[in-house]
């Protein structure tokens, strides 16, 4: 099935754009949602995380204590790699399962770290980047998540640069101050193009 990898920095508007594609009938497979699901109460990853990091990283409801884990992986690169060694294979398994059950004309994989992964570009037919300037990202995430500016800057610094994402892009949606109607029009135009690609793609 024809596939699009949708990516962008934190706060760029990936969820809004993916929801617009979903409303037009594309199958959406969101790796962030899968990551949350496997670390939710009694999620697939939780027994492995508890064994690797200890019970102090498991919240009372059986989910991942995200604040505690975030603090650890920002201060300890090896901890981040240990966490990813647990979560990434499970996320890949789930994305493949969801894509295999897809009913739309094409599938959109929402992958925040698509460029950073080093593997996703080869797994999709097109890369679509939702782009905005860094100050816009920071302001949006501070407002949405209640994070301090320093926290958001640290997250942005760990992600691929804007230039690196744009270099990987086949298609770009600029979302600095775009209205929902403007975004919807851009998505609708891309949707028509992707339907054409999907129809021409070998099964």
Curated annotation (Swiss-Prot):
Keyword Cytoplasm in annotation: yes
Residue intervals of the DPCK domain: 3-201
CDD domains: DPCK
Any Pfam family matching the protein: CoaE
Gene Ontology biological process terms from the UniProt entry: coenzyme A biosynthetic process
Signal peptide: none
UniProt EC number: 2.7.1.24
Any one GO molecular-function label of the UniProt entry: dephospho-CoA kinase activity
Catalytic class of the enzyme: transferase
Record-level GO cellular component terms: cytoplasm
Pathway noted in the entry: Cofactor biosynthesis; coenzyme A biosynthesis; CoA from (R)-pantothenate: step 5/5
Location of this chain's protein in the cell: Cytoplasm
InterPro entries, alphabetized: Depp_CoAkinase, P-loop_NTPase
Stated family: Belongs to the CoaE family.
HAMAP family: Dephospho_CoA_kinase
Descriptive protein name: Dephospho-CoA kinase
Species this chain originates from: Burkholderia thailandensis (strain ATCC 700388 / DSM 13276 / CCUG 48851 / CIP 106301 / E264)
GN (gene name): coaE
């Amino acid at each position: 099935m024809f596939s699009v990898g949708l990516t962008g920095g934190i706060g760029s508007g990936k969820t809004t754009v993916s929801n617009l594609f979903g409303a037009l009938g594309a199958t959406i497979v969101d790796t962030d949602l899968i990551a949350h699901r496997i670390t939710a109460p009694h999620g697939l990853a939780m027994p492995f995380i508890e064994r690797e990091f200890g019970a102090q990283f498991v919240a009372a409801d059986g989910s991942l204590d995200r604040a505690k884990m975030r603090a650890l992986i920002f201060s300890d690169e090896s901890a981040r790699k240990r966490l990813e060694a647990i979560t990434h294979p499970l996320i890949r398994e789930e994305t493949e399962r969801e894509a295999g059950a897809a009913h739309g004309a094409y599938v959109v994989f929402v992958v925040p770290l698509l460029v950073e992964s080093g593997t996703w570009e080869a797994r999709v037919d097109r890369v679509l980047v939702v782009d905005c300037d860094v100050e816009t990202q920071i302001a949006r995430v501070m407002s949405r998540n209640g994070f301090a500016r320093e926290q958001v800057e640290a997250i942005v610094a760990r992600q691929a640069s804007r230039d690196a994402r744009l270099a990987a892009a086949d298609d770009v949606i600029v979302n600095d101050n775009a209205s929902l109607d403007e975004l919807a029009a851009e998505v609708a135009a891309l949707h028509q193009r992707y339907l054409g690609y999907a129809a021409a793609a070998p099964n």
